[in-house]
């Protein structure tokens, strides 16, 4: 793992030990949760039944997946893995800019969309960490 100064040496060692598994986890979780039609990542997926439990798609899942894909792409030496990471990165980028960004309100994102693609009234997270934002009051 390339050191970026973002973590302590002990944290980077632990991350480095698990880094080889990250592209596999990324690919499977993306396959489980990405809804290509409406362009987003669902909130919950049941690993036993292989069904979406909550098809609401919060905005933040896409940039977080882009970050994971970028890390896996950067750290992988395998061309096939790098290509898969770029495909995930591209799909998330395109979905975010096509379906979540709102130019009419200074590029603010839609918080949550439903499976049909329309804006959902659902609040994407709990309000304890950031009461203003997560309640739509900020």
Predicted regions and their residues:
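Glycan-recognition and catalytic cores of secretory/periplasmic carbohydrate-active enzymes
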Residues: 1-138
């Amino acid at each position: 793992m390339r050191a970026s100064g973002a973590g302590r040496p002990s944290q980077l060692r632990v991350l480095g030990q698990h880094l080889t598994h990250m592209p596999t986890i990324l690919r499977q979780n993306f396959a489980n949760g990405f809804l290509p039609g409406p362009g987003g990542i669902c909130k919950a997926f049941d690993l036993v039944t292989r069904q979406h439990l909550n098809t609401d798609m919060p905005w933040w899942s896409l940039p977080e997946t882009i970050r994971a894909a970028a890390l896996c792409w950067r750290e992988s030496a395998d061309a096939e893995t790098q290509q898969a990471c770029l495909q995930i990165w591209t799909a998330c980028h395109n979905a975010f800019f096509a379906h979540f960004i709102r130019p009419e309100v200074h590029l603010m994102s839609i918080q949550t969309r439903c499976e049909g693609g329309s804006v959902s009234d659902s609040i994407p997270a709990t309000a304890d960490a950031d009461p203003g934002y997560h309640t739509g009051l900020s």
